[in-house]
Amino acid sequence: MLNLFRNRKRNGAGPTIKKAQKMPELDDFLSNQDYEGAISLLNHKLKAGNLDREEEDSLQLWLAHCYYRLRNYEEAANVYTFLMNKDDAPAELGVYLACCKFYLKQYIEAKSIAEKCPKTPLCIRLMMNVSLRLNDEKRILTFHSSLGDTLEDRLSLAGVNYSRMHYQDAIEVYTSVLQTSPNLIGLNVNMALCYAKMDYPHVAYNLIKNYLRNFPNSPFAKNLLLSVLYRTITSKTTVDEKSELARNIDQEGLTMVSDMEALLKQKLYPEIEYICKHNLVLFKNCETALQVLPSLMKHIPEARVNLILYHLNKNNVKDAISLCKDFDPVTPYEFLVKALTFLRHGQETNSREHLKIAENFFQMVGESGLVQDTIAGRQSSAAYLFLSFKFDDVITYLKSIEAYFTNNDDFLLNLAQAYLMYKNYVAAEKLFIRVSGPERDKILYKSMLARCYVRNKKPQSAWDMMLKTNNPSDRMSLLKVIAQDCYIANEFYYASKAFHEIEISDPTTENWSGKRGACAGLFRQLANHKTDPILISQMREVVHLVAMKPHSNCEFLLKVVRNWAETHNVNIIN
């Protein structure tokens, strides 16, 4: 009977009593990073009362801390101010309040408060960052020299280096910290940011991937990964085929938009949400640029930059230059965008002033120690030198980065133009022919290639390209290039044909003079090579063209040519 009773209890027969759940304490909320829950608990305890001064102050401090961690710096500042107004308030509260003012971008106020506080390590780090925001270089160096060798001081220094665009210095600090504290995996993201800024996308990609293996749900890391993918795809630079980035870029590139849309469905801090919205516009080829980017400009500097680029890509140079009026560049990339805008505006309006400003901006970026030896830095130097007509130096700079742009049409065109202006027509022609995209259909491309053909003694190729051009305006432009360049290059047969076609559409004295001069030039060549069958055939055709469209002076020219042909027994009569 006793055994049966025991079995019934073991089998769960009979009533069971639920164990009462333990109410969460402050430590539970803090350990789970549930700061909203912690704030609710703290406010409840504060309203309940029955607290002595020490207990109340402790709860208020935790309340301020939770507001701070939620980035609600205004509320945190209010709590710290309330505590500071009490008798015998701890002096370090001023530093905490100054930190709130710093994140509220109230730098002057943060400086004023911090200067009255004890010079603790936290205060020194804060003052160094405040000085950075106020562009006070002297004070930055002063507080830098006061830093110790603690982890916090080293990481603060790395952050300042990053903000000053001293990316390599920041990387060295992060690398040193990781050697002694490999558990600080988050520093991989900081280093990835540095490498991304330095145009080493494959290194940045590997570092972010390493972090995401441990924290796959990090919104910031996911956004950074997608940004690196986007930048790599759109820059069209060559990526090391053996790298993890090269192996994954095609597949991951296909899901960039859906990945970013999924990320935006998460609960994000406002700053991260702004960045993600901005990047989603880029991933969608700026389809919603005009609707989204203007509202983001006050939150994200890149929004203005990309809106300027959007207008430039749409050939809305007037709108782009308008956005530059209130735009004070800080980073080399921002200076590049402003330089490009001034360049385009200067070219469209023939404004030497804007072209000179663009030249100065390009030179400034190219000579900057921050990007001097990067791809962007060398491209900037090349642009400056091109505007300065130093084409041999342009070629030197562009050749130094050619390996990164093996199939990039924009790069090929820039290098080809430099060779063309340097009068190395053979090298220019080879590069122009390698262009494979829509630029081949533009009149500027065809005009430059035609010039190369003519100077490389291939006028027939230039003529054939003109015949395949359907747009009447482009066709006429090509005829003018062929006529003038063939005349200069002593290719008088094609010069005559081109001037003849131009004269049909525009029968001016100038065009007739060009045709007459080309005919006379071909006649002189024939006179020196009387038995050349090609020249005889060409002269026969040109005489026919001159006779087709009579002019007041053409009879004399034809008479001279025919008399010479008859005297020398050369048949130029059809």
From Swiss-Prot:
Component of the intraflagellar transport (IFT) complex B required for transport of proteins in the motile cilium. May be required for ciliary entrance and transport of specific ciliary cargo proteins such as che-3 which are related to motility. Belongs to the IFT56 family. It is found in: Cell projection, Cilium. Keywords: Cell projection, Protein transport, Repeat, TPR repeat, Transport. This is Intraflagellar transport protein 56 homolog. Component of the IFT complex B composed of at least che-2, che-13, dyf-1, dyf-3, dyf-6, dyf-11, dyf-13, ift-20, ift-74, ift-81, ifta-2, osm-1, osm-5 and osm-6. It holds the Pfam family TPR_19. It comes from Caenorhabditis elegans. InterPro entries: TPR-like_helical_dom_sf, TTC26. Disulfide bonds: none annotated.
